[in-house]
Amino acid sequence: EVGALLADWLLRRGVRGTYAASLVSGSLMHALATAHGVRTAETPTGFKWIVRAGTDADPLVYGYEEALGYAVAPDVVRDKDGISAALAVALLAAELKASGRTLTDRLDELAREHGLFATGQLSVRVEDLALIADAMARLRAAPPAALLGRPVEPADLAEADPPVDAVRLLGDRVRVIVRPSGTDPKLKAYLETVVP
C-alpha cells in the first residue's frame, strides 16, 4: 500500500510524467494515475527496468515494486531510494495529521474512491528446480479459463518485450501472475482482486 500512497501523494501534488511499477506490484497505482490522466508503465521486476520506463515526452517521475523499493525522485537517484521514500512518507503523514487523518484513513478513502485492491502472494519452495520448470510448462500449455468463477485471459509473458518468465491471468477485477523466483528455489503466485 505504501507504493500506492506515495503515487497518490505525488499525483495530488500535480507531479506529471510516467508512473511505473513492476508487473507483480498491485495495480492501484495504475488506477490512480489513470484517473489523473497520467501515463503508467508496467515493467519486469527489478529497478533496472523501472527506471527505464519513462519516455522523452513523459519522463519517469515515480516507480515502485512490491518488494519494497521506491523511486520518488528518479531524476535525482535512478534506483530505489529508501531515504527519499522515507522522507516522502513522513511528509505525507504530516500533511494527513494536520487534517486529522492517518495513512490508514487515506487508504480507506482510496478504497472508497477506486475500489479495494486486495493483494497477496503464495510461494511454493522446492528442492528440485525441474519442478518449477515443469509447473510453468503445464500452466502455459493449459491455463485456467476462469478464476473465482470469473473468466480470465491468459498471457504468456515470455512472448512479451522484454520477455519475462511468467504467466498472467487477467479478468474482471481479478489478476494472478505466476513466475519462478529470481533469487530462491520457489514458484510464486501474485494474487489481486478488486472489490468495487
Q: What residue spans do the PLM features occupy?
A:
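Basic, amphipathic juxtamembrane/active-site segments
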Residues: 1-8
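Phosphate-binding and adjacent anionic-ligand microenvironments
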Residues: 5, 13-182, 186-190, 196
